[in-house]
Every structure is written in structure tokens, then in C-alpha cells.
UniProtKB/Swiss-Prot annotation:
One BP annotation, GO: alanyl-tRNA aminoacylation
UniProt note: domains: Consists of three domains; the N-terminal catalytic domain, the editing domain and the C-terminal C-Ala domain. The editing domain removes incorrectly charged amino acids, while the C-Ala domain, along with tRNA(Ala), serves as a bridge to cooperatively bring together the editing and aminoacylation centers thus stimulating deacylation of misacylated tRNAs.
PANTHER family in the cross-refs: ALANINE--TRNA LIGASE, CYTOPLASMIC, ALANYL-TRNA SYNTHETASE
Protein name listed in UniProt: Alanine--tRNA ligase
Record-linked Pfam families: tRNA-synt_2c, tRNA_SAD
Catalytic activity: tRNA(Ala) + L-alanine + ATP = L-alanyl-tRNA(Ala) + AMP + diphosphate
E.C. no: 6.1.1.7
The encoding gene: alaS
Domain of life: Archaea
Organism (species): Korarchaeum cryptofilum (strain OPF8)
Family classification: Belongs to the class-II aminoacyl-tRNA synthetase family.
The protein's required cofactors: Zn(2+)
Chief location of this protein within or outside the cell: cytoplasm
Disulfide bonds: none
Cellular component, GO, one term: cytoplasm
Length: 895
């Protein structure tokens, strides 16, 4: 890819040079030797405020500038990239238009257009804070895009640069001699092209990409559509204009100081902060693998303070910066439908949450993370994003739940880490990644338990890089497509009339032993809906059709029995009971999904579905279990929709038109890789891109009964249901069971509720009495064990094996029953391990340290533990308990 020749810049007197520091080519108007970008040159804009504008004002100035120059303003897309098979998060404005618009397959929503797109990018997450605002995990990419096709030329390189130049000089007020244009190559989302990066004051404030290639097998292939792909950093431009000490001061303003007060962090002297921020450009070297400690040392030398003083004053503020950024990102992600989990975009949300909790822990703050995330939603809802206000309750609940889950992970972590340490001796980076990926244990927790562990400065970036993109499932390739192409595509009668169950068709031929017809009403397997079955009849012969499958534009029919010859006309019958049941269940799936979204919240998304004849299932994303009351409301709403007998329409729409009309909830069933979408709309209630067969009105579904809601994996709930006649049959069976139970109990059906409540109360009392008796028996057992002590040196040692009560209850009893100086070891089997408690009863401090003794000995045995001088708690593998007790006796003899 060659350099860029820009006639506009030549005409303004710019010349092309090569930077002696970074080796990159750039365009400059004056006698400049370097490219002007940090770290080749330091930041010069800090302390030189040009305009005291807010983020909202800068955004509006930009959009209005381009509107006045023929661009159509369009609304932002979600930060969760539901329309992409290869990405989880919207990381740039061009992501909104890839791959179909950039490939010229579908038209853009406007051409040219302008947008300010919130983006989430986690590849630099460990640099957020230390680089003072240069790196952010959430930012707004202001952009203007033009899509040049063979039929329509909009503008290209010169006009793009001219538009930036005019905006920079007339709106931002930057003298043109202060602007340099640095050349580069951009790649992203499967596309590439040369770019220019305008630099001013040491800061890159935009990227102008001339996308003209698609990347295939590592090679650049020219595109039919040439795309102007620009990105103007809203936060960077605001920082540049205001000249504030850091980008966080410019972006967050009063909210920054509010967070500092909440978190107990004082702002350092602003002159020190400004000087550090100016030289913080050297932290770009983090990208080359240098450690933050070595760069901090260099920065301290440059501004004339000690490394210790700089660390003490700057590090807490950097932590506040990180929390500001992360909680804003979380509020947008959750508002746009993210549910934290261990997979996909949910994993990335959880990564942000756990990194934030780690930072709060380092600060020693007890402020709930949920409080900070909610405050961000409140703040930004009044700054151009009113949709965040509707999500405040959900943000608070989700983050609170995740905080509790993190605490649980930490509590479980000691054993996991101890086991791994025993196996490996010293933990590697791969071990740290595994502990985080599989168990949610951050390096800080690992270090707390395992001691000295080498943690890379970019640990969370390494984690994010593994999960930020996904490889789409490769389409199943039918190996005999060349044979199929010899025949005309199959006419799909099931789309013309889903109730067509009998038809005539001509046999065109066979591929792979499967029949090709000129037309068919047999629905092929796809989208969670099984294929139709039925029969073919010709010349008095009848054979079974046991399946149908679609490859490209052709339907192949699997037939059992004699095969009619090519050219024969067959009479086909689709199994009506199966077809109609599947139609009802498929439309019911759409109804239940929308009902769940309306009851539980807009974060609910279809994870998977399977439509059956008697029973179907729908898997949805949700951050906690579904209560019986919520399930009842979902079921009631679904049946109300059935009773309203709403029309179900099928439309074929160009992708961009469908997205404009219905939004991205179209893709509940997954991304549909087609330029024209088949949209199934339950009028005024729900619309989805869907290729399945459906009823024409919701009343045809019949009753909907949801039988079960259960968690099948982290963040996913499975709803199992029946519709129509199968639902009625299940209800009848259910009622019969109630009758049978009532008859067995000798009561009426109406008395069942009262009868079983009484039984449960009685059972509760019996269990309570049983626990009391077991406790008394255990107390007597402990008393006997304490009487039968053994002497170990100058100590009395009593060993108590607990049977029916837990270790904590045993500690209370042992402490109460010990009347003299006694070392008491309590053991309680738990799976393949034994829980331990070591008590030094009636000892004075400094005589025996039970906590230290238990911790030391249990670690030697592959366990772990700790405590204070009076009490230690821990565990060891069951097969090493006797060894533990033997070593304990020897140690006590020496104390």
C-alpha cells in the first residue's frame, strides 16, 4: 500500500517529510522536522485553553458543521454489536456499517452521513488512567462517512481532508501551521486502507481512513465500494480545546471531583499534575512493552520530583480516572442490553466490573460499585443520552449482584490457588489467565494467597484481547453444490402459503441420493425449527418424506422407499399435525420472548430456541433467576396477546430499512447474513428477522403454558413451554395429578393447599426437633472427647470429629465446654477434603498461635487456612488428615 498523495495539502503549501524519531511520513506546513505526535513531541496544548466548551457543545458543533455541508445526521447505534457475527462490542463508528454497507450489498441509511457513536474498546484497558485521558475504554467517535460506488461518487481523499481542515481551523480555531497530517495504514473489521492522522499540540485528534480493500487470507483485495471512514475523538478534542490538566478533567468536570470525594482521594497540586500530564505522552511506550514503573521513573526525572512522591500523588488519582471510565462504560453496556456472564459480551462486561472492584479494593474504599455506575447513568442521561435513565434500576441490580458473586469467587479462591501452587510451585502468566478466566480470580487475589507473583502491566488487556472478537461459525458447505447448480432453484411454497399442505411438483433429479423438486411446501430444518415430514405419491406408489434440508436456493428431500424418476410429477402431502404444531410453537416463541422483555426488561435477548411438536424451549439472557410471580406475568401477557388475535405479517425488507423501522431487536434469533430480510411482525407487539413458518393471527396459537424456568448456565434462563393442543393436554394431565394427590390424601382438590401447608409446618417442626436432638448428642460427644485428651509436651490435645453439625457450631460448643487450658482440633469431612478448626482455649496471647500454626501445617498438606492466636480455620485433603494430626502433635511437643 503506497503513501497518500493529497492535492489539497499541496495547494495549501504542505510538504511531505519523514519523522526521524518514529520513521513515519507526515505532511507539514512549516519547517518541522518531526511528525508532531507524542512521544516524538511532548503535549503542548495543556494549559493553553482555546475554547471553554463542554462535551455536548463540541459534539453539537461537529454534527452541525457536517449537516451544513450536506451530511445527514443519524442516531447512535447500541454499544453491543448485535448486528455483527464477528464482534461483541461497537468499537468504532464504521462497525455500524460493516459488513453489508461497506461491501456495497445494501445501501447506507444516508450518503454522506454524520454520527457521534459511543464506542467500547478494551484493548488498552490497562492504560486507562495512567495516560491521563489519551486512552479510554468508552469514548465517542464523531464521524462523517461517504460510500462511493460505481453508480454514485460522493467524495474521496481531497474533499475529506478539506472538510477536516476547515473544521479544525474554523470551528476548533487551530492555526493550520500547527496541524500535521501523519500517514498510516488502517485495518479493522475485515477492511483496510491508507489513512491520515491529523496531529495538533502533540495529540492525534482524528483519523481519516480511505477504506478501499477487504482482507482475504491476509491479502488486500480492492473493494467495489470505496468508503470514507473518519473518526474524530470527541473526548480528545474537548481536552485539546480546554487545555485541562487531564482528559478526565475535560470530560467529567464536576463528576470527577464528586468521585474523588466519594473515594477519599485528594487532587494533587494542579501544576504538578499538568507537568506530569504533559510528559505522560511517554507512556505510549507501554504499547511497546515497557513497564509502567520504568516509565514513571523517567517521568519523575523529567519533572524534577522523586519517583516515590509521584507515585504517592498520582496513582490514587489514576485509580479514580479508571473508575470514572469503567463505570461509564458499564452504564452504557448494561443500558444497551448486556448481561454479565462467562461468555461473549457478558464476559467483557464482567471483566470491567471485576477490574473496577479490584481498583476499589486497592483504594481501600467501601463505596459500592453499583452506586458509582448508577451515578454515571444519572449524569449522562442529562448529557444527550436520556435512554440511560430508564436503565438505572437494572444497572444498580446487575452490578450489585456481580459484586456479591465476586466476593463468593474470592472466598472460593483460597483452595483453588493453594491446589495449583502445590501442583506447580510457581504460577505463570498462563496460570493467572486461567485463574481469571475460569474462576474470576484477579492477580491481586492470587498474590494475596500465593505471595510473590509476576503480573504483567497489561494483564487485563491480554484477557480482553482473547475475548473481544469472535470467530463466526463457518457456514456448512455442501460438498456437491456444483451438482445442485445444474438445476433451477426450488420455488418455496411454504413462504407463499404456510397452510399449503398438499401440492404437486416435478422431480428434477437427485443429488447425494436426495430428491430435488421444482417447487416444495416442505420446510427444511433451520432456525431451531425441525424440518417437515410427509409423503410423495405417484402412479399408485407412496413413499415417506423423512426430512428436508436447504443448501443455497435448493431444497433436498430425504425419501424412504422407491424413488420416482426424474421428470415424474408427484403428489406431495406435508404432515399437517406436525406443521401446524410447529407453526404455533414458533409464533409462540416470538410472543413469549417479547413478553419476557416487557416483564423482565429490555436486556432480555434470545440465546437459543428449539421448536418441537409437543413442547418447545426458549433460552433467554437474564442476570438472576425468574420468580414465580414474574413467570406468571410473562405467561399472562403471552396469553393476552393470543386472545387479542393480532395479525402476524411477513415482510421482505432491505436490511437498512428493516433496521430503521424495527431496530436491532430484529436479530433476536441471531445475525441473518442477507441483504434482504424476511421480517415476521406480530403487529404492534414484536418484529424479528426470521425464516420460519408462522400462523397468520396470534389467536391460532391457542393457549400457551410455560412449564418450567431454570438456569442452564451463567446468565441464561431456559423457558420450557407448550402451545395449542399440546398445552391443553399438559394442563389436563396436570389437573389429573392434582385429583390423584387429593384422592390419596383423602381430601378435596380445594383443600390441597391448606393440607400441604399444614404438612410442611409439621415437617418444619420435626426437622427443628431433630436438629435440637442432634446438637445435644454432638454436645455430649464433644464433652466426652474433651475428657479424653492426650498429652503432647506440656499441652493437652483433644481431637473432635464432628458428624451432624458444622465447624462453626462445633467451635462455639468446644469453646463453651473447655474449662481448662486445652488445644482442641475439630475436624469435619466435606467431600474430598476435611474442614479444620484449631482452638487454643484458656491460653494467653503469645503462648500458642493457633491461626499461624494451622495455616503453616495445612499448607504443607496441600490445604490452606489462617486466623488469630486463639482460633485457626482451614482445610486439608481427606487422605492427608492423619499426616496432619501427626505433624501437629510433633509441633505441639516443641512449643
Amino acid at each position: 500500500m503506497q503513501g497518500i498523495e493529497v492535492e489539497f495539502l499541496r495547494s495549501r503549501g504542505y510538504v511531505r517529510k519523514r519523522c526521524p524519531k518514529c520513521g513515519e511520513y507526515f505532511w507539514t506546513l512549516k519547517d518541522r522536522e518531526t511528525c508532531g505526535e507524542a512521544p516524538c513531541e511532548p503535549y503542548t496544548f495543556i494549559g493553553r485553553g482555546r475554547q471553554n466548551k463542554s462535551l455536548e457543545e463540541v459534539r453539537e458543533d461537529f454534527l452541525r458543521f457536517f449537516e451544513r455541508r450536506g451530511h445527514t445526521r443519524i442516531n447512535r447505534y447500541p454499544v453491543i454489536a448485535r448486528w455483527r457475527e464477528d464482534l461483541f462490542l461497537t468499537s468504532a463508528s464504521i462497525v455500524d456499517f460493516q459488513p453489508f454497507i461497506t461491501a456495497g450489498i445494501v445501501p447506507p441509511p444516508a450518503n454522506p452521513l454524520t454520527i457521534s457513536q459511543p464506542c467500547i474498546r478494551l484493548k488498552d484497558i490497562d492504560k486507562v488512567g495512567p495516560t491521563m485521558g489519551r486512552h479510554l475504554s468508552i469514548f465517542e467517535m464523531m464521524a462523517h462517512h461517504a460510500f462511493n460506488t460505481k453508480d454514485k461518487f460522493v467524495y474521496w481523499i481531497d474533499r475529506t481532508v478539506e472538510l477536516f481542515h476547515e473544521y479544525a481551523t474554523s470551528v476548533l480555531g487551530i492555526p493550520e501551521e500547527e496541524i500535521t497530517y501523519k500517514e498510516g495504514i488502517w485495518e479493522g473489521g475485515g477492511n483496510a486502507g491508507p489513512d491520515l492522522e491529523p496531529i495538533a499540540g502533540g495529540l492525534e485528534i482524528a483519523t481519516l481512513v480511505f477504506m478501499q480493500y477487504r482482507i482475504e487470507n491476509g491479502s488486500y483485495v480492492p473493494m467495489d465500494t470505496r468508503v470514507v471512514d473518519t473518526g474524530y475523538g470527541l473526548e480528545r478534542i474537548t481536552w485539546f480545546l480546554r487545555g485541562d490538566p487531564t482528559g478526565f478533567h475535560a470530560v467529567y468536570g464536576a463528576l470527577l471531583h464528586e468521585f474523588m470525594d466519594k473515594l477519599g482521594v485528594s487532587e494533587p497540586d494542579l501544576s504538578l499534575l499538568s507537568e506530569y500530564s504533559k510528559v505522560s505522552s511517554i507512556l505510549r511506550e507501554l504499547e511497546k512493552g515497557r513497564s509502567i514503573s520504568s516509565l514513571r521513573r523517567e517521568a519523575a526525572l523529567l519533572i524534577g520530583v522523586s519517583e516515590e512522591e509521584l507515585e504517592e500523588k498520582i496513582a490514587p488519582l489514576e485509580a479514580v480516572f479508571s473508575l470514572l471510565d469503567h463505570t461509564k462504560a458499564l452504564s452504557f453496556m448494561i443500558a444497551d442490553g448486556l448481561v454479565p456472564s462467562n461468555v461473549n459480551e457478558g464476559y467483557l462486561g464482567r471483566l470491567l466490573i471485576r477490574r473496577s472492584l479490584r481498583i476499589l479494593n486497592q483504594l481501600g474504599s467501601e463505596v459500592p460499585l453499583s452506586e458509582l455506575a448508577v451515578r454515571q447513568a444519572e449524569y449522562w442521561s442529562s448529557k444527550g443520552f436520556p435512554e440511560l435513565r430508564e436503565a438505572i434500576d437494572r444497572i444498580a441490580e446487575i452490578v450489585s449482584i456481580e459484586e456479591e458473586r465476586y466476593k463468593e469467587a474470592v472466598e472460593r479462591g483460597a483452595k483453588i490457588i493453594s491446589d495449583l501452587m502445590r501442583e506447580k510451585g510457581r504460577l505463570s502468566v498462563d496460570d493467572l489467565i486461567m485463574l481469571y478466566d475460569s474462576h474470576g480470580l484477579s492477580p491481586d487475589i492470587v498474590r494475596r494467597i500465593a505471595g510473590d507473583v509476576d503480573v504483567p502491566d497489561n494483564f487485563f488487556e491480554m484477557i480482553a484481547a482473547r475475548h473481544e472478537a469472535r470467530k463466526p461459525e463457518p457456514p456448512k458447505v455442501f460438498e456437491r453444490m456444483d451438482e445442485l447448480r445444474r438445476y433451477p432453484p426450488t420455488k418455496l411454497l411454504y413462504y407463499q402459503d404456510p397452510y399449503l399442505l398438499e401440492f404437486e411438483a416435478r422431480v428434477l433429479g437427485y443429488v447425494d441420493g436426495k430428491m430435488i423438486l421444482d417447487r416444495t411446501a416442505f420446510y427444511p430444518e433451520g432456525g431451531g425449527q425441525p424440518s417437515d415430514i410427509g409423503s410423495f405419491e405417484w402412479r399408485g406408489i407412496e413413499v415417506k418424506v423423512v426430512g428436508a434440508e436447504k443448501h443455497g436456493g435448493w431444497i433436498l428431500h430425504s425419501v424412504e422407499g422407491d424413488l420416482p424418476p426424474a421428470g415424474e410429477v408427484v403428489r406431495a402431502r406435508v404432515d399437517s399435525w406436525r406443521r401446524l404444531n410447529r407453526m404455533r410453537h414458533h409464533t409462540a416463541t416470538h410472543v413469549i420472548l417479547e413478553a419476557a422483555r416487557r416483564v423482565l426488561g429490555s436486556h432480555v435477548w434470545q440465546w437459543g430456541a428449539q421448536k418441537g411438536d409437543e413442547e418447545s424451549r426458549l433460552d433467554i439472557t437474564h442476570y438472576k433467576g425468574i420468580s414465580q410471580e414474574e413467570l406468571r406475568r410473562i405467561e399472562m401477557l403471552a396469553n393476552e396477546v393470543v386472545m387479542r388475535n393480532i395479525p402476524v405479517r411477513t415482510l421482505w425488507l432491505v436490511r437498512t430499512d428493516a433496521e430503521r423501522r424495527y431496530g436491532f431487536t430484529l436479530y433476536q434469533g441471531g445475525v441473518v447474513p442477507d441483504p434482504v430480510l424476511r421480517v415476521v411482525e406480530i403487529e404492534g407487539f414484536n418484529a424479528q428477522a426470521c425464516g420460519g413458518t408462522h400462523v397468520l393471527r396470534t389467536g391460532e396459537i391457542g393457549p400457551i403454558k410455560i412449564w418450567r424456568a431454570r438456569k442452564i448456565q451463567d446468565g441464561v434462563i431456559r423457558l420450557e413451554f407448550s402451545a395449542g393442543v399440546p398445552a391443553v393436554k399438559r394442563i389436563i394431565d396436570y389437573h389429573q395429578k392434582i385429583k390423584d394427590i387429593a384422592q390419596s390424601a383423602g381430601i378435596s382438590e380445594e383443600e390441597i393447599d391448606t393440607f400441604f401447608r399444614g404438612m410442611m409446618e409439621e415437617l418444619k417442626e420435626l426437622r427443628k426437633e431433630r436438629r435440637r436432638m442432634m446438637k445435644e448428642a454432638e454436645e455430649r460427644s464433644i464433652e466426652r472427647a474433651l475428657e479424653a485428651y492426650e498429652s503432647t509436651g506440656r499441652h493437652k490435645l483433644s481431637i473432635v470429629r464432628l458428624e451432624s453439625i458444622g465447624i462453626d457450631e462445633g467451635i462455639k460448643l468446644a469453646d463453651k465446654l473447655s474449662s481448662d487450658r486445652r488445644i482442641v482440633l475439630l475436624t469435619k469431612e466435606s467431600g474430598d477434603r476435611v474442614e479444620l478448626a484449631l482452638l487454643a482455649t484458656n491460653y494467653g496471647e503469645g503462648e500458642v498461635d493457633a491461626g499461624s500454626l494451622l495455616r503453616e501445617l495445612s499448607r504443607e498438606m496441600g490445604g490452606g487456612g489462617g486466623g488469630n492466636w486463639k482460633l485457626g480455620k482451614g482445610s486439608v485433603p481427606k487422605d492427608r488428615l492423619d499426616e496432619f494430626m501427626g505433624v501437629l502433635r510433633k509441633r505441639l511437643e516443641g512449643i
